[in-house]
Amino acid sequence: MASPRAFTALMSLALLVAGCQGAEAESFTRLPVPKPPAVQGQQPVLWVSLAAHLGPQPLLLEGASAPLQLRDAQGERVSGRRLSLRWVQQPLPEPLEIRRSVLGPFASFEAAEQAALAWNALGVAAEVAHPREWEVWAPADLAGPKGYPVRQVQQRLTQRRVLQLNTASGWRSLQGPVQLQAPGGLRFNGGVFAGPFRLQADAYGSWTLVEQVPLERYLQGVVPHEIGAGSPPAALAAQAVLARTWALRNRHRFAVDGYHLCSDTQCQVYSDPRQAGSAVRQAVSRTTGQVLALNGEPIHAVYHASNGGVSADEDEAWPLPELRYLEPSLDWRSAPPPGLTLPLDHQEVAALLARQSGVVGAAHPLFRWRRQLDQASLRKGLGARAASLGSPLKPVVLERGPSGRVVRLAIEGPGGQVVLERDAIRRTYRQLPSTLFVLSPSGTGRWSVVGGGFGHGAGLSQAGAIDLAARGWSVEQILSRYYPGAQLVPIQALPAEDHRGAL
């Protein structure tokens, strides 16, 4: 174990000792925080980040209609309608060495989690972190699992970031975590949130504003932002079930930072629940406590805006093990036309993209789309990786999945190639709404990209759900179409929290 002084330094950060590498090195894998509480019971509560990576920029918190009530870890209490906070650097009693092995960055949590599981299978205590990008962390000086390059990171910490509150007598240091009550709501990011709240340190030395929000209230802040408040009732209800299921399945997503979920597109977009209209509230109420499950576990309830006429399987989006409820299928109102059978090759994808009539969800604005790639955009997407390739660059589709989506795309040059896989394709070239596309030359150093759909394509197509609901389909029929074999069950039927969830 580390020396008493090093241990005291960690405790002064309100963190638990973890990743200790021995007395001589006195190094740690990371600055750990306590895990969030279990998400369980008939009325589970989620810890959701409203703002992450806080500091050193100041933070102003404002009560919507009543004073805020603040209490820090030492019992200091302050009340005020507006609370002005800042972070300052203070020296540690003794420097701390942070050393770790790192995989990534990854394009998504799903890809990072699979890498962590591969490392776990080798007996390595690996975990997913999100300092700015998705990474996997483990103790220092370890080899990565097969196929994953590993790098070593070392930091020497001599200061800590301390939270301070502006009072009538000057700036007062606060000991985290800080509890915050908002009897009249907290005005934040254009909305009003009921709370309660916490300000707490994360694994990176910055801070997070967390709302402790009951699951059903959380859904009121998610559903309208994910599918649109004006969607038909059955589509709203389907979205409520999926958002509830997704939240439970992903409750471990930010465990390294001491909370469950974020509130942006890395999770589900969550905003002011008070702005939910009656249709959204009815959809949440109508499905209260209902989740999609298989074998007693919440499914991987992924969804997206538009599948372009064909659903993807899980392996076309992320390197996940086979999930039998996520399977490729042509999303037609009746039988698909002759000549379109799975798996789709290049010609069949082109034929699919030439069609719109008879396809479910064809009203979405990105159901069909066109983009251009040129030398500048190819190089910009790759960033530093393009330097060794030389000029000119050329995109080449190496492999398609069963639905015809591109799962391996090479950017080739005289000096070699960079191969992008699955979700890394759209992360690298964000102008592409999906990976359901065909490439064709459109001049020297230019390519036309004709595609369909918006998003990864796995699971429910929101445009499809809206279309089907408008045609009289029930919520049960919609969910059964996009997740065959999964069952609607009450939350009480799920097993106790295990902080990981089931694939």
Question: Where are the language model's segments positioned?
Answer:
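Conserved, single-site charged/polar hotspot
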Residues: 2-503
